[in-house]
Amino acid sequence: MLILKSFVYTVVASFVSLFIFGFLSNDPGRRPGRKRI
C-alpha cells in the first residue's frame, strides 16, 4: 500500500510540474503583461 501511495504521489507531482512548466512557458507568449505568478 505504501508503494502504491508513493507511486501515485510521484505521478501526480510529475503531472503538476509539467502543467506548471507548460503554463509558465506558454503564458508570456500568449498574453504578455496580463497575469504574473
UniProtKB/Swiss-Prot annotation:
Subcellular location per UniProt equals: Plastid, Chloroplast thylakoid membrane
Q: Does the keyword Transmembrane apply?
A: yes
User: What domain of life is recorded for the organism?
Assistant: Eukaryota
TM helices/strands, residue ranges: 1-21
InterPro entries listed in its UniProt record: PSII_PsbI, PSII_PsbI_sf
GO BP term (any one):
photosynthesis
Q: Keywords of this protein's UniProt record, alphabetized?
A: Chloroplast, Membrane, Photosynthesis, Photosystem II, Plastid, Reaction center, Thylakoid, Transmembrane, Transmembrane helix
Give one Pfam family: PsbI
List the disulfide bonds in this chain: none
CC annotations in GO: chloroplast thylakoid membrane; photosystem II reaction center
Q: Which family does it belong to?
A: Belongs to the PsbI family.
**How would you summarize the oligomeric state and partners of this protein?**
PSII is composed of 1 copy each of membrane proteins PsbA, PsbB, PsbC, PsbD, PsbE, PsbF, PsbH, PsbI, PsbJ, PsbK, PsbL, PsbM, PsbT, PsbY, PsbZ, Psb30/Ycf12, at least 3 peripheral proteins of the oxygen-evolving complex and a large number of cofactors. It forms dimeric complexes.
Name the UniProt record assigns to this protein: Photosystem II reaction center protein I
- Say which species the protein is native to: Bigelowiella natans (Pedinomonas minutissima)
Species classification: Eukaryota, Sar, Rhizaria, Cercozoa, Chlorarachniophyceae
